[in-house]
């Protein structure tokens, strides 16, 4: 069965306040539905989208909600009281591709244009973002395509701790499916009237029960329940973000610091960057990301990694696991064939790992922006305080600024010729508590000032919680030298991890003092390198090119700044072009400087 749009069922009757009465009705409804199909035989046609059906009360409402949650075919509860209200708006309202077109189980025609990147890989063309106002009444946000007259009179039903709102996703790579299903049980604000609302791209199959939604795994050809965070509404987050970006002149922060905080706290930027790498923020809005969803994404990637690294790669298993990942972490592929997006190489796995890492940082940033404990402060100043960092802008004519500019210029690798970088601002930075934790490693020796780069989306999380090591759920194969924090002595090696683009040229870089101690030097990658030999404090991935050691600067307290011009070391024949430094204890890291830069991309004729 294929449908476009949505359906609504109404229920007239008083709400049952005693839990046992509700359970009794549900048991009765369950028996009736299990003994015979509702509304006819197995081949009976379903009601067309837009019907409003009368149900007998909240019990029938909840039963219908749960029945629709994992439908094979939808048989609406039959009643003699058919309401006349129509919801044609659901048919005509602009929607995403999945809701606006019927998708078949077979291959879909490619109706989207694609661009080629420098390596010849297809990239999904970025679509202009449409801003949709969310309406939150009660615990959850009403779906954006519910008619306005319903929004003004109804809210999402909540019974105890149960919030009857579900967003589901199903991706089946082999069948070229990438489908969503949204369902909400609605109660009138005045009480006594109820509705079930649903919107979908295609209808799925049974077998995931509402009671087991949180602990359920992904199954082939089944919908996967996406856990939402029912914290502050997106509307509030957007309001605070707007205040941050539009009121720079009112803050008591120094102007350069205020501009930087505004840059890294921009939710619109975060959404756009995620859209550019394929994430579908319409199906699972960034503001509703839950920690458990992110950990599930890591877990699926870990299982994909195990298959890829196995002796015999099972293509069928990779298809199933890829579908599971896209069900947990929704993507927007337009109408491209799903077979093009199977995660079957270490490179594709690493790209998805970086996406989930970015989503993890965004989840932290969203929580910061929703925190209203400092509402008496200007929004920018409130965010500044949450970072627990002191930022001191460096003057262009200062010795420190000159030293850092030299370090940046000298260590731009010859193989990274696709861009140049302009410094916007450099800040001296100090995180609360870092110096004290770092002190126990200060006597270990071999302290270096090294580069670290990351996506612009990640910096609110990094500055508020510090640099962190990937969780146990993350696949170890995504990290060349095991799970740790990675640094470089070549600026451009770290700058590449900023993932800047023509659409977003801003980047942020850290210079950290890192207590390396005695290093375990490796010429080739080793996923188990985090199990350091006795006496070693860090790993050095030895590159063929490094800054001239003789030109390094040593500070008064003994920290080495490798700002010399790069030179090739003939005796080195490893797999790395440039050095990498990895520590596995975040107490060995002390942030010293943070740079805001602009990337200038060269155009090739």
From Swiss-Prot:
Matching PROSITE patterns: PARP_ALPHA_HD, PARP_CATALYTIC, WGR
A GO CC term attached to the entry: nucleolus
SUPFAM superfamilies, alphabetized: ADP-ribosylation (SSF56399), Domain of poly(ADP-ribose) polymerase (SSF47587), WGR domain-like (SSF142921)
GO BP term (any one): double-strand break repair
Subcellular location: Nucleus
Coiled coil: none
Protein origin, superkingdom: Eukaryota
PANTHER family in alphabetical order: DNA LIGASE, POLY [ADP-RIBOSE] POLYMERASE 2
Stretches assigned to the PARP alpha-helical domain: 250-370
CDD domains: parp_like
Catalytic reactions of this protein: NAD(+) + (ADP-D-ribosyl)n-acceptor = nicotinamide + (ADP-D-ribosyl)n+1-acceptor + H(+); L-aspartyl-[protein] + NAD(+) = 4-O-(ADP-D-ribosyl)-L-aspartyl-[protein] + nicotinamide; L-glutamyl-[protein] + NAD(+) = 5-O-(ADP-D-ribosyl)-L-glutamyl-[protein] + nicotinamide
Residue span(s) of domain WGR: 153-260
Region of interest (Disordered), ranges: 96-122
Record's keyword terms, sorted: ADP-ribosylation, Glycosyltransferase, NAD, Nucleotidyltransferase, Nucleus, Transferase
Database matches in Gene3D superfamilies: 3.90.228.10, Poly(ADP-ribose) polymerase, regulatory domain
Membership in a protein family: Belongs to the ARTD/PARP family.
Single annotated GO MF: NAD+ poly-ADP-ribosyltransferase activity
Occurrences of domain PARP catalytic (ranges): 378-605
InterPro entries assigned: ARTD/PARP, Poly(ADP-ribose)pol_cat_dom, Poly(ADP-ribose)pol_reg_dom, Poly(ADP-ribose)pol_reg_dom_sf, WGR_dom_sf, WGR_domain
Keyword Chloroplast set for record: no
Official protein name in the record: Poly [ADP-ribose] polymerase 2-B
Provenance organism: Oryza sativa subsp. japonica
Sequence ranges of Basic and acidic residues compositional bias: 108-122
Gene giving rise to this polypeptide: PARP2-B
Catalytic activity, EC: 2.4.2.30, 2.4.2.-
UniProt function note: Involved in the base excision repair (BER) pathway, by catalyzing the poly(ADP-ribosyl)ation of a limited number of acceptor proteins involved in chromatin architecture and in DNA metabolism. This modification follows DNA damages and appears as an obligatory step in a detection/signaling pathway leading to the reparation of DNA strand breaks.
């Amino acid at each position: 069965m294929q449908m476009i749009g949505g359906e609504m069922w109404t229920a007239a009757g008083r709400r049952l306040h005693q839990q046992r009465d509700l359970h009794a009705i549900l048991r009765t409804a369950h028996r009736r539905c299990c003994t015979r199909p509702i509304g006819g035989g197995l081949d009976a046609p379903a009601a067309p989208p837009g019907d409003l059906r009368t149900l007998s009360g909240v019990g029938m409402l909840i039963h219908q909600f749960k029945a629709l949650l994992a439908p094979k075919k939808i048989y609406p509860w039959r009643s003699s009281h058919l309401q006349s209200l129509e919801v044609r708006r659901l048919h005509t309202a602009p929607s995403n591709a999945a809701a606006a077109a019927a998708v078949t189980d077979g291959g879909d025609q490619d109706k989207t244009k694609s661009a080629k990147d420098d390596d010849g890989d297809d990239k999904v063309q970025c679509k202009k973002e449409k801003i949709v106002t969310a309406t939150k009444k009660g615990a959850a946000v009403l779906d954006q395509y519910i008619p306005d007259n319903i929004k003004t009179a109804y809210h999402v039903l909540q019974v105890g701790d149960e919030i009857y709102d579900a967003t589901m996703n199903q991706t089946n790579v082999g069948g070229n499916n990438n489908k969503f299903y949204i369902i909400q049980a609605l109660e009138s604000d005045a009480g006594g009237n109820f509705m079930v609302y649903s919107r979908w791209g295609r209808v799925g199959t049974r077998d995931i029960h509402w009671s087991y939604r949180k602990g359920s795994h992904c199954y082939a050809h089944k919908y996967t329940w996406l856990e939402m965070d029912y914290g502050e509404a997106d509307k509030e987050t957007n309001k605070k973000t707007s205040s941050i970006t539009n009121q720079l002149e009112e803050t008591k922060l120094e102007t350069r610091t205020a501009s930087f905080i505004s840059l890294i706290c921009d939710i619109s930027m975060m959404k756009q960057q995620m859209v550019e790498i394929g994430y579908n923020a319409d199906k699972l809005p960034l503001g509703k990301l839950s920690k458990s969803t992110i950990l599930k994404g890591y877990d699926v990637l870990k299982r994909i990694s195990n298959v890829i690294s196995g002796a015999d790669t099972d293509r069928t298993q990779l298809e199933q696991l890829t579908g599971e990942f896209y069900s947990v972490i929704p993507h927007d592929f337009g109408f491209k064939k799903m077979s093009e997006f199977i995660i079957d190489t270490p490179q594709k796995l690493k790209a998805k790992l970086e996406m989930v890492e970015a989503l993890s940082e965004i989840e932290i940033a969203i929580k910061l922006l929703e925190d209203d404990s400092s509402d008496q402060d200007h929004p920018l100043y409130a965010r500044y305080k949450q970072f627990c960092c002191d930022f001191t802008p460096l003057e262009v004519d200062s010795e420190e600024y000159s030293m850092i500019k030299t370090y940046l210029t000298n260590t731009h690798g010859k193989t990274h010729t696709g861009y140049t970088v302009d410094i916007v601002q450099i800040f001296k930075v100090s995180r609360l508590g870092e110096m004290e934790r770092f002190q126990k490693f200060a006597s270990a020796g071999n302290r270096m000032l090294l580069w670290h780069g990351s996506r612009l989306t990640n910096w609110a999380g990094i500055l508020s919680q510090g640099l962190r090591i990937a969780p146990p759920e993350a696949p170890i194969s995504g990290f060349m030298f095991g799970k740790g924090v990675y640094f470089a002595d070549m600026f451009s090696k770290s700058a590449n991890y900023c993932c800047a683009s023509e659409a977003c040229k801003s980047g942020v870089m850290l210079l950290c003092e890192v207590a390396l101690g005695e290093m375990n030097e490796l010429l080739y990658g080793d996923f188990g390198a985090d199990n350091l030999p006795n006496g070693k404090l860090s790993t050095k991935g030895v590159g063929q090119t490094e800054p001239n050691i003789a030109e390094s600067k040593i500070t008064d307290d003994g920290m080495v700044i490798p700002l010399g011009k790069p030179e090739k070391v003939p005796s080195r024949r490893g797999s790395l072009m440039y050095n990498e430094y990895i520590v596995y204890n975040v107490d060995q890291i002390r942030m010293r400087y943070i740079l805001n830069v602009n990337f200038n991309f060269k155009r090739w004729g």
